[in-house]
């Protein structure tokens, strides 16, 4: 018997972004529950339910960006994956030690200070 498993990409409906320590102090507005939105730069984006922040893929850096909804699709944000990790991954599959945040310059986040979790709806067919 042959099984075909097809992952259609980053289709998680609801994700949780949690920040701790200095990342939280610098970027607290980015923390919360995000809902799946339209594709941006060829990949799924998510919008924070309670304010005007979003999570999207940035092709030039091949990383995920968490920033203002006004900056959606650009390279401008307050938290980002670090090291070209977005091209073959979903943001909730990026290691918790592979993020950086802005605080008068980019700072590599300590392990587990930036956490992104898929809460609902990432079905594999």
Language-model regions, residue ranges each:
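Cleavable N-terminal signal peptides of Sec/SRP-targeted secreted and luminal proteins
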Residues: 1-9
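Interface elements of modular peptide-recognition networks comprising either
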Residues: 8-122
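Extracellular carbohydrate-recognition regions
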Residues: 125
């Amino acid at each position: 018997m042959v099984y075909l498993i097809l992952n259609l990409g980053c289709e998680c409906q609801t994700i949780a972004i949690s920040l701790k320590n200095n990342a939280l102090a610098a970027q607290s507005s980015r923390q919360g529950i995000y809902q799946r939105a339209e594709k941006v730069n060829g990949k799924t984006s998510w919008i924070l339910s309670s304010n005007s922040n979003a999570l999207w893929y940035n092709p030039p850096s091949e990383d995920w960006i968490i920033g203002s909804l006004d900056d959606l699709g650009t390279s401008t944000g307050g938290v980002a994956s670090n090291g070209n990790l977005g091209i073959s991954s979903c943001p909730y599959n990026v290691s918790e030690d592979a993020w950086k945040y802005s605080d008068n310059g980019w700072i590599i986040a300590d392990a587990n200070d930036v956490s992104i979790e898929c809460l609902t709806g990432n079905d594999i067919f």
